Amino acid sequence: MSKPLVIVESPAKAKTIAGFLGSDFVVESSIGHIRDLPRNAADVPGALKGEPWARLGVDVENGFKPLYVVAREKRDQVNKLKALVRDASEVYLATDEDREGESIAWHLLEVLSPQVPVKRMVFHEITRGAIERAVADWRELDRRLVDAQEARRILDRLYGYEVSPVLWKKVMPRLSAGRVQSVATRMLVERERARMRFRSAEWWGLDATFGKDGATFGAVLAAVDGRRLADGKSFTEDGHLRPEAAGVVVLDEAGASGLAARLSQSDFVVRSVEEKPYTDRPKPPFMTSTLQQAAGSKLRFTAQRTMQTAQRLYENGHITYMRTDSTTLSQTALAAAREQAVQLYGPDSVPSSPRTYQRKVKNAQEAHEAIRPAGDTFRHPREVARQVGPDEARLYDLIWRRTVASQMKDATGLTVTIRLGGTSSTGEDAEFSSGGTVITFTGFRRAYEEGADHVEAPTGGNGADGDQERRLPPLAEGDDVEALGFEAEAHATKPPARFTEASLVKALEEMGVGRPSTYASILGTIQSRGYVWKKGTALVPSFVAFAVVGLLERHFGELVDYGFTASMEDDLDAIATGNEEAVPWLTRFYFGNGTPGLRPMVSDHLGEIDAREINSIPLGTDDQDRLTVVRVGRYGPYVQRGDDRASVPEDMAPDELTLARAAELLEAPSDDRALGTDPGSGLTVLVRTGRYGPYVQLGEEETGDGAAAAGGKGRGNGSKQAAKPARVSLLKSMTPANVTLEDALRLLTLPRSLGSDPSTGEEVMALLGRYGPYVKKGSDSRSLGSEEQLFDITLEEALVIFAEPKRWQGRGGSAAPGRELGEDPAT
């Protein structure tokens, strides 16, 4: 007997939903997208390989018609779904209710071609009630959402496939450009440029301790002789006093210490007491971006880790759909949150009517609720923690507290600001300021403070981030207070903080660039492409990012313009609502209409781009008028002054590479030396030190545009063809000072072929990687016990190692090489 077939994206979701629907339904997953634009030339059907548009996968001359292909790895699953469709009484397409989910549903419909009724089934949480309602309240496929997603996909393909090759030719291979990733990279580079321009300004202040009726409290110097004391806002980014701050007092160490001494015997009186009501309002429930921000700052989760954890919570029925830019709660959720607050914190914890929140996100468009605990009643974090892993438990706790707190009353209290004054022994009038806050009603803060392993700092309306309760003794205007001590305190302006994953997501969201579902993947891409690396939680742009952003700003400025990129999101929204047609819009973007389109922009500018100029970042000139630049080389960044070069240390951030630091690198003694001549080739054998440590090299490399020595100082010969010489890292037992020609020639035999596996024909190699010695056969790698084995292990011994079960060592053991991450820079 035929049964209804429900198709979802993931096996985990299919398993959960099948449990709710029972044996009357068949539930299967598509395992994500089943087809897409071709990833490479091999995916393009033979009959179309000769077409001029084949590399794009989009026929730009024929209405931007996309070429869709079923991925090889999805063909078995597609065949399985086709068989299930043939036996089904009806088909429910139950993919996520957003543009991407609607697109997946449409592709399923196109590929499977069901001959039975097809229904679009949507839900925002995976609970029994939600799934049963979704089966009953199905709808038709929304073709406008499909068109909008298709336009977005085509746009990103055109952008990436047209601009990325420019980067390969002018900067280095394997780079990529993208509508959102290039803007994100520009933001990181601009912030680093600001840090490089920054010059710190120093000033001194005075901290005081006062006493009254046995109670003590602190205060800071606010004014001298009626003139305000300087603070961080008084200075520009280059360390100068702002014009509007011309009248402020700027103390140095001697001035602050001297004033402290002159005030040590002074009498002080309370000059004013100002009281203001204090209100701290709860934040809205989470949407995707704010969840990523909170999980990043409170749990130290990356955006990707947050989304993967949220996905598992969603698929197992613990939270609602996690890709949304809505802060709205359904009536059911409002009731559940209020009920939970009343149960845990009493009837006085909630306001008389539910709280609603207005979305402030530019281009907000997702149709879902905010992210909240699933169900008509919320399960307490302790209950959920017994059923999920540690990451899931911590993230659920964060979501639960934020949701419940959003429906509780404000925290209220009183903020008191006191001004105290006295006269120094030389007649100077010194005024100090002290403030305190007393919380009289904790309100929503109870949801964060009670029983939490981590506390999200409550912030809101009138409260500053991280407001802490600070009590002052009862004081009135005219009261005498005792000065118990003074301490001069140094202060300095700080450069603008680098972005973290959380703050970058927030900035992109505020500008209307990207979508909730894209932020995690964008952050992953800019890191995997080498545009950024992490220093703690801070995102540090590489010099490669500087070169790429410089090229795009100079020659493709519109493509990384924040306003233009956000306007594209507006246009895609208009396509989704039917107010814009995809093909005319893509035509304007690609071919132009009054302004240059993408294709002419690339073809017209490519010849103008000077690769050497793009890959050079000036640091300045020294006292001998010699220009020092950072160059992006094939083997890493290096500094150059005249003919002298030196590698930039791998862990050096751009703002740390000052002109003085570059001079130190250039003038440092070099470990480079010639060891002798290779008898076989006649080439010089050298030992050098590069960004990944010391290595031996056979012959001098040729350098051209964008190529440079991997380490130490050297001279280029101006050749346009860059040849990469053989290089091998030194063994742990070797140093540049003690390595001999014999050692080097032995190292240069690596990687060493041991022969082929008789059973599979695969070549077996002995290699030295960044993480130690190992043998490799096909995609299988095994660590070796010692570096000496590299030179004497036989094929038979290697095959014995491969025949044993792979053992992953714990602490103190030899770590298995794991998956391949790429070529070792030396070998």
Go through the PLM ranges and name each one:
Residues 1-153, 162, 235, 247-250, ...:
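Intrinsically disordered, low-complexity regulatory segments
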Residues 2-5, 15-16, 23, 45, ...:
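Basic, low-complexity terminal or inter-domain segments flanking catalytic cores
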Residues 11-14, 31-37, 97-101, 124-130, ...:
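Conserved nucleotide-binding/hydrolysis micro-motifs of P-loop NTPases
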Residues 79-80, 86-87, 126-212, 275-279:
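C-terminal or mid-to-C-terminal helical accessory/interaction module adjacent to the motor/catalytic core
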Residues 96, 292-294, 298-302, 306:
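A conserved hydrophobic secondary-structure block that centers on an alpha-helix together
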Residues 29, 69, 165, 190-191, ...:
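Accessory interaction regions appended to the cores of large information-processing enzymes
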Residues 170-174, 189-252, 298, 443:
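C-terminal helical "lid" subdomain and adjoining coupling/linker elements of P-loop NTPases
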